[in-house]
Amino acid sequence: MPGSPRRAPGLLLQALVAMVSLALVAPFGLQPALWPMPRSVQVFPRLLYISPENFQIDNSPNSTAGPSCSLLLEAFRRYYNYIFGFYKRHHGPAKFQDKPQLEKLLVFINLEPQCDAFPSMSSDESYSLLVQEPVALLKANEVWGALRGLETFSQLVYQDAYGTFTINESTIADSPRFPHRGILIDTSRHYLPVKTIFKTLDAMAFNKFNVLHWHIVDDQSFPYQSITFPELSNKGSYSLSHVYTPNDIHMVLEYARLRGIRVIPEFDSPGHTQSWGKGQKNLLTPCFIQKIRTQKVGPVDPSLNTTYVFFDTFFKEISRVFPDQFIHLGGDEVEFECWASNPNIQNFMKKKGFGNNFRRLESFYIKKILDIITSLKKSSIVWQDVFDDQVELQPGTVVEVWKSENYLNELAQVTASGFPAILSAPWYLDLISYGQDWRNYYKAEPLNFEGSEKQKQLVIGGEACLWGEYVDATNLIPRLWPRASAVGERLWSPRIITNLENAYRRLAVHRCRMVSRGIAAQPLFTGYCNYENKMEK
């Protein structure tokens, strides 16, 4: 850790730890309200003044990431604009030349920087930040920690009543509590333009989320444009303009990478697949009534070899397109009625000795899909239904707990069985309610279940989910933010950070900060933002 910054004579304060309100640092409304709260914060009363004309963000001379690290260079430019975005250049010299100034922020990467890599579950997001005259130093082992530290530094800078940029001398040491901190978006119920996804990724970076769970297809539409099976989107999308082309996917992946965000695609099956059947013949199960075939189709047909040939080829493509180690396979809400009505399925189950136990049929199918993913050297995530239905899961399969009933008990059962878990049950943001529902999201504690320390280490994080039945590009951003910010702090900050009133004060400022950066985050309650008149800029 770097040494403590200089203290102004006679003004020495005890270090302000994370639980203490930052209102002491600056007047309310101008305070550098940190969100999410870092693991360790020391803020001192000595103010440094910043001249936008002279201030620089640059690589430290001995950093392993040099001037060729385009990820960092782009981040330096981006955060300079975030900090000084509404600044109007003065004519003439700055008025505080005789006062202590901060002239630079130097960024030092200690290990292999990973400038050209994609982030992963094991990426190191830790960093330390020392702010003192005349140069601040941001240290990180990898570029991912530097990105998180740049966000924190930007939140420390504020403007006084005269428009002067200032920052308090500070020392911060920080790292995330959980490695998986996600936002789920749904692009099947409503297509989301790529620009809207970009805006979501921006806001995620402001809140230190690191996973975009992309629920890309579902019953309603199939907007993913497959190279191998183009008819899936040609016939399954809402229209030929409501698709994500290979170039669209590439742009989203790169935009996310530059912000230290992983993109995990979800291709849910055997249920939630009605749109698949429009472009892939004989994939879905024909439904019968009294042994007469109807026009209706049900889940994927698990009895046909052609089903697994298709998925083997399809997931080979997905494994090439999406670089992340994980693919989400869904597996939720499988309806057995259509399978039960189909004579071919009945005969298949007899041959396999499944009797009338359709959970065994589901298990047979899911295991085949899991084997395909494993053969591609990828790992799987499934919804809790797969675990609840006693499907035989491979070691390391991640179970996402989404059902609100007894979700803590579910976490206990999943982890007791040795499987990693992701929690999303208390964070379904599509379930809107009047008032400050963010407080309920904030109070949800992922590890508040009875279990051993080993079990709790298997909880790798959580996700805020915004399903798309009533959400499109017109309301996605204000419905997500700042409500998802509460989840962001719960997943990043130490468990002891629980004070709601302190959180409200900081989140109100953070919400205004997001507004100033072009994120149309809805208000927490009554009040105002300094930059509201410039939202459209």
Curated annotation (Swiss-Prot):
Keyword Flavoprotein appears in the UniProt entry: no
Highest taxon in the source lineage: Eukaryota
Active site: 333
Role noted for this protein: Hydrolyzes the non-reducing end N-acetyl-D-hexosamine and/or sulfated N-acetyl-D-hexosamine of glycoconjugates, such as the oligosaccharide moieties from proteins and neutral glycolipids, or from certain mucopolysaccharides. The isozyme B does not hydrolyze each of these substrates, however hydrolyzes efficiently neutral oligosaccharide. Only the isozyme A is responsible for the degradation of GM2 gangliosides in the presence of GM2A. During fertilization is responsible, at least in part, for the zona block to polyspermy.
Record gene name: Hexb
Protein name (record): Beta-hexosaminidase subunit beta
Molecular function as annotated in GO: acetylglucosaminyltransferase activity; beta-N-acetylglucosaminidase activity; beta-N-acetylhexosaminidase activity; carbohydrate binding; hexosaminidase activity; hydrolase activity; identical protein binding; protein-containing complex binding
Glycosylated residues in this chain: 62, 168, 305
Enzyme category, top tier: hydrolase
GO terms of biological process kind: astrocyte cell migration; chondroitin sulfate proteoglycan catabolic process; dermatan sulfate proteoglycan catabolic process; ganglioside catabolic process; glycosaminoglycan metabolic process; glycosphingolipid metabolic process; hyaluronan catabolic process; intracellular calcium ion homeostasis
Transmembrane segments: none
Subunit structure and binding partners: There are 3 forms of beta-hexosaminidase: hexosaminidase A is a heterodimer composed of one subunit alpha and one subunit beta (chain A and B); hexosaminidase B is a homodimer of two beta subunits (two chains A and B); hexosaminidase S is a homodimer of two alpha subunits. The composition of the dimer (isozyme A versus isozyme S) has a significant effect on the substrate specificity of the alpha subunit active site.
EC number(s) stated in the UniProt entry for this protein: 3.2.1.52
Activity regulation text: Addition of GM2A stimulates the hydrolysis of sulfated glycosphingolipid SM2 and the ganglioside GM2.
Residues of the signal peptide: 1-23
Localization (cell): Lysosome; Cytoplasmic vesicle, Secretory vesicle, Cortical granule
Catalysed reactions listed for this entry: Hydrolysis of terminal non-reducing N-acetyl-D-hexosamine residues in N-acetyl-beta-D-hexosaminides; N-acetyl-beta-D-galactosaminyl-(1->4)-beta-D-3-sulfogalactosyl-(1->4)-beta-D-glucosyl-(1<->1')-ceramide + H2O = a beta-D-3-sulfogalactosyl-(1->4)-beta-D-glucosyl-(1<->1')-ceramide + N-acetyl-beta-D-galactosamine; a ganglioside GM2 (d18:1(4E)) + H2O = a ganglioside GM3 (d18:1(4E)) + N-acetyl-beta-D-galactosamine; a ganglioside GM2 + H2O = a ganglioside GM3 + N-acetyl-beta-D-galactosamine
Family membership noted in the UniProt record: Belongs to the glycosyl hydrolase 20 family.
Keyword annotations from UniProtKB, A to Z: Cytoplasmic vesicle, Disulfide bond, Glycoprotein, Glycosidase, Hydrolase, Lipid metabolism, Lysosome, Signal
GO cellular component: acrosomal vesicle; azurophil granule; beta-N-acetylhexosaminidase complex; cortical granule; extracellular space; lysosome; membrane
Disulfide bonds: 69-115, 287-338, 512-529
